[in-house]
Amino acid sequence: NDRGVAHILEHSVLCGSRKYPVKEPFLELLKGSLQTFLNAMTFPDKTMYPVASRNKKDFFNLMDVYLDAVFYPNITEETFMQEGWHHELELPDKNITYKGVVFNEMKGVFSSPENILDRHLAHSLFPSTTYGFESGGDPEAITDLTYREFKNFHNKYYHPSNSRIFFYGDGDTLEYLNFLDNEYLKDFESIQIESAINAQRRFSKPKRKIIFYPVSKDESLDKKTFVVVGFKLDKSTNHEHCLAF
């Protein structure tokens, strides 16, 4: 759906965990580690938590903080409201408004006509798949997300059986794997998680869609129309087919 649960969860797991119950461990790592890369990103079909460091001790510490955040986050209801959405009243005579880190972020994203166009194109080409929805969250739908749905999403999908863990660089892979197993993976049983993505079926005829985007009331409407044509290609593993386009 368009409620942005994966995006809100990406923010929320980095707001304290079992071993690191501080408010924002992500910011603490940015300030106090030797990291060369530290981030988290939500895509329509996955969420990534990459870390990098050229210092071995620091790298293991980064791994520990991130693994604990992913598999054992606190994700309290207060965190959900902070990172997702909540009601806010600035003054008694003002209207109640919606606020939230992800809610505000996506309002900014949806203020760009290019972003709106790009998203509607993907959603129109793949309506029956996860790519047909706004993984970051549509501000008009984010406020429908409940704390229970938020928690259930983590319980269902944030499991080692539904993950891919990659190491890259000149390091001792066996040492990394032993750390993973001894500190985290040994505590989980292998389970079956249904997260496969089915291919979008071809359309019987071309689809046409008119969408709208906002402009300020003082802004001219001249030369503000966009036209885009999109094609659904074969799987990306069919290199010749994709290269032809």
Identify the meaning behind each predicted range.
Residues N1, K19-K57, P92-I96, G100, ...:
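Non-catalytic beta-strand/loop surface segments
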Residues R3-C15, F245:
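Active-site recognition of the HExxH zinc-binding catalytic motif
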Residues G16, V51-Y98:
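M16/insulysin-pitrilysin zinc metalloprotease superfamily fold
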Residues R54-D58, G169-L174:
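Helix N-cap motif at beta-to-alpha junctions
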